[in-house]
Regions:
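N-terminal segment of the mature soluble domain
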Residues: 23-25, 31-98
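Sec-dependent N-terminal signal peptides
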Residues: 3-14
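A solvent-exposed, charged loop/short amphipathic helix patch at secondary-structure junctions
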Residues: 53, 110-119
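Sec/Tat signal peptide C-region and signal peptidase I cleavage site
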Residues: 14-20
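C-terminal/domain-edge helix-coil "capping" segments
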Residues: 20-23, 101-102, 116-176
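Short, solvent-exposed beta-strand-terminating loops
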Residues: 95-108
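Short, hinge-like loop/turn segments at secondary-structure boundaries
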Residues: 75, 108-110
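Residues that line or immediately flank small-molecule/substrate-binding pockets and catalytic motifs
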Residues: 8, 93-96, 150
Length: 176
């Protein structure tokens, strides 16, 4: 009985945490190693967020090609974002290619996270599943994190298709 109560308490805290996000706008940053993967991810994710009523600005629109992601926390960029009323950063990265991954236990500040290198590409030929990690930051502090696991993704096209199918459900939860 104690275990059941404890599980319900944990579930309730996660659902309350998800409800507090109230996502209306986002600066989207795909933390991927290869530039073509970053472009593919940001364009597709921006499209999905826009279709679901979230004001989105991909980092590709703010940075010059090859620029460091840490530039996104510079004063000049923050001023531009404030003028556009964008207050939430969303860092998206590939956590891994199997179903065993958990949320990161140690997530630092926005500046620290932007400087971390992520080595996984968006897609590899031999994978069957992929896990994405979504980290939301407001005022340079982590305010929410969540994993999205996609199964049976044997091609890049299937991966994008499944992302278009599953992500809108999460976005609706994040908007609530």
């Amino acid at each position: 009985m104690k275990k059941l109560f404890f599980c319900l308490l944990i579930f309730a805290s996660f659902s309350l945490n998800a409800q507090r996000l109230k996502l209306t706008n986002v600066v989207l940053v795909a933390q991927l190693d290869r530039s073509e993967d970053k472009f593919t991810a940001e364009i597709n994710l921006a499209e999905i967020f826009a279709e679901n009523g979230v004001n989105v600005l991909p980092s590709l629109n703010l940075l010059k090609q090859g620029a460091s992601l840490s530039t996104l926390v510079s004063d000049s960029i923050k001023t531009i974002l404030k003028e556009k009323q964008l207050d939430t950063y969303l860092l998206v990265n590939v956590r891994g290619y199997d179903r065993q991954f958990r949320l990161s236990s140690k997530i630092g500040s926005l500046t620290e996270e932007l400087n971390i290198a992520h080595m996984f590409p968006l897609f590899r030929d031999e994978i069957t599943s992929i896990t994405f990690e979504f980290n939301f930051f407001r005022n340079d502090k982590l305010c929410h994190t969540e994993l999205l696991k996609l199964k049976n993704v044997s091609t890049k096209e299937k991966l994008i298709q499944k992302l278009h199918k599953k992500l809108p459900r999460l976005i609706q939860r994040w908007k609530a």
